[in-house]
Amino acid sequence: MTDEDLSDFLDSDGLPNNTEDVDIGNYHEGNDLNDLTGKEWIKFTKSWKIYRPRSRGQSEKDHPAKFPEELVEDFVGFFTQEDDWVLDPFMGTGSTLVGCRSMGRNAVGIELTEKYADVAKDRARQQSLNPVQLEVMNEDCRDALSNLERKFDYCLTSPPYWNMLKKSRGGVESEHKKRENEGLDTKYSDSKRDLGNIDDYEEFLDELEKIFLDVYDVLKNEGYLTVVIQNIRTEDGEMKPLAWDLASRLGETYVLKQEKLWLQDDKPLGIWGYPSEYVSNVAHHYCLIFKKVE
């Protein structure tokens, strides 16, 4: 498809023109992955996208690591069809469920921390024009996954970025310090079952790999898994390639299909290493895309 073919659909920034007369293309009867036309399909295949999260209520802000509902809508819209079932084993406050509801998909979310699960339940109960089923499980996903009775069409999730939330990164103006000063959570919980409290990197990866092997068992064949994650920097300045290490491990069971970058152009910059050492301002996440092929 050429740029000329898309000229009546996208504006100069590559975004949909906001008119009722837009030609969104034709739906292909052989498309058994999603409900998109070719013109809608091609938009998603760009390897990066900027997401700016919507404003959130106080209870949602308390969770220290959320991803945007718009991201959920894009990924769920591409990897599922209407009425399909989506799984999120690290649900947090329910962004995946909210995005699934707006897209007409059913979803199950699993969350270890009770107060976050309660927020997700409240969000799931909000009225919607889409009559979907949204289920919240306040459990450890290592226990819950083996008890699920259905197979899922897709899994979208964002696990803890190792123990990053326990470590303050930067000086007085770091995000960690800002949340601390506002009385917001700076880590998920104090539970020994919380993966974010594992201090040994290899042990953390081992536990994470086991969980996604359990996810493999409840995914339908040909179903996709998307893991939103980052490479991280330790307190002593070493980069841990968490995203790449996880991709390598899961690629032994799943087919690693691609990565898509979630870019944050509204994240404030900090002058962390000045004037003696390089420390980057990380403003992107990896959305690792895997496929189950038996």
Where on the chain are the PLM-derived regions?
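Class I S-adenosyl-L-methionine-dependent methyltransferase catalytic core
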Residues: 1-294
